[in-house]
């Protein structure tokens, strides 16, 4: 006979998927709303020749309907961009931007969604080498330079982007989250707003030192 404790454990295990589904529901800003102008998303590929030479990556550019090509747009950069730009997954950033810009709750903003780089295989049938941790977890100004010297100038050739650091934001999750912080920490003169989803402030590549580093920095 199953004792009561075992029965309770079984009930909780069976109920866990249902509880998880009920734990969070997307709000209206994450849903396409009738009458809200929809921005456009285009996909591109970037081969780095300067900061991360030899790496290739996909990236996406979101341009809101309200962008007029004359007024400089605010900018927000996302690491692991394929996750954030996908309107069928949880973040749905293009949809959220559509709704918030339409309501006047955020400025006209161009979104840049970057996947981490990979190094293509040198032999047929080989697998690409992922560069994510090196790019995201390293505590240096290298990734900030990548954005400022490669990506933003390239996007800036197509769209008019603001130079105001207060109108530039960067975000990411996990290693992409600590990467976002590091960019703003290294270059506060270029990025002033950070969205870090459960950033990996652990000793992957030294991120655990940030609390002490912040305390000691004037």
Kindly label every feature range from the protein language model.
Residues 21-218:
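Non-catalytic cap/lid and distal C-terminal segments of serine-dependent acyl enzymes
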Residues 7-8, 18:
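Cleavable N-terminal signal peptides
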Residues 1-7:
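Bacterial N-terminal signal peptides that target proteins for export
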Residues 11-12:
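Short, linear, compositionally biased motifs with a strong N-terminal bias
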């Amino acid at each position: 006979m199953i004792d009561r404790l075992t029965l309770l454990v079984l009930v909780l295990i069976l109920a866990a998927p249902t509880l998880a589904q009920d734990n969070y529901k997307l709000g209206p800003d994450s849903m396409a709303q009738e009458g809200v102008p929809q921005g456009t998303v285009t996909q591109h590929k970037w081969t780095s020749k300067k900061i991360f030479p030899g790496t290739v990556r996909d990236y996406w550019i979101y341009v809101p309907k309200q962008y007029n090509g004359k007024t400089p747009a605010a900018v927000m950069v996302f690491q692991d961009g394929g996750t954030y730009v996908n309107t069928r997954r949880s973040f749905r950033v293009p949809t959220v931007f559509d709704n918030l810009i339409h309501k006047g709750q955020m400025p006209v903003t161009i979104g840049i969604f970057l996947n981490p780089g990979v190094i293509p295989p040198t032999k047929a049938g080989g697998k690409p080498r992922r560069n994510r941790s090196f790019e995201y977890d390293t505590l240096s100004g290298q990734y900030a330079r990548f954005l400022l010297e490669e990506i933003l100038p390239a996007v800036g050739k197509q769209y008019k982007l603001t130079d105001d650091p207060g109108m530039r934001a960067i975000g990411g999750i996990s290693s992409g989250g600590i990467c976002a912080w590091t960019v703003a920490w290294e270059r506060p003169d270029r990025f002033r707003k950070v969205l870090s989803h459960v950033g990996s402030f652990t000793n992957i590549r030294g991120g655990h030192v940030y609390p002490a580093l912040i305390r000691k920095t004037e």
